[in-house]
Amino acid sequence: MAMPNFGDMMKQLQEAGAKMQDVQKQLEKLVSEGEAGGGMVKAKVNGRQKLLELSIDPEIMDDVDMVQDLVVAAVNKALDASAQLAQNEIQKAAGGMINPADLLKQFGGQG
């Protein structure tokens, strides 16, 4: 069995790290939105799961319980959409990167 080329593996790891840093920067710019109550409450989050904006229709402000429920629902929808978007971006960036199973095979593991 041939010995793995550690220089090539280190280069691949460095490239993968740089690529993932780029993805993290891109995720900050991507925005997902969630809404609840037919649009009475809207939330926007970025791809890093940070809440950017929350808007509430002033007409529903008298019903605190409903506002709270709608805020939670809108934020959760936005976070779910953001998580899916982030996962897609990471998978796109990971194309061709080091596969852990391949590393195991190089070292005689099961992979």
Swiss-Prot record:
| Superkingdom field | Bacteria
Which residues, by range, are in coiled-coil regions? none
Q: Which UniProt keywords apply?
A: Cytoplasm, DNA-binding
Its biological function?
Answer: Binds to DNA and alters its conformation. May be involved in regulation of gene expression, nucleoid organization and DNA protection.
What InterPro entries does the record tag this protein with?
Answer: YbaB-like_sf, YbaB/EbfC
Its source organism is Chlorobaculum parvum (strain DSM 263 / NCIMB 8327) (Chlorobium vibrioforme subsp. thiosulfatophilum)
In its UniProt entry, what is this protein called? Answer: Nucleoid-associated protein Cpar_0834
Pfam families in the cross-refs: YbaB_DNA_bd
Coarse class of the protein's main subcellular location: cytoplasm
Q: Name one GO cellular component term.
A: cytosol
**What family does the database annotate?**
Belongs to the YbaB/EbfC family.
What do we know about how this protein assembles, alone or with others? Homodimer.
Keyword Electron transport on this protein?
no
Provide the protein's localization.
Cytoplasm, Nucleoid
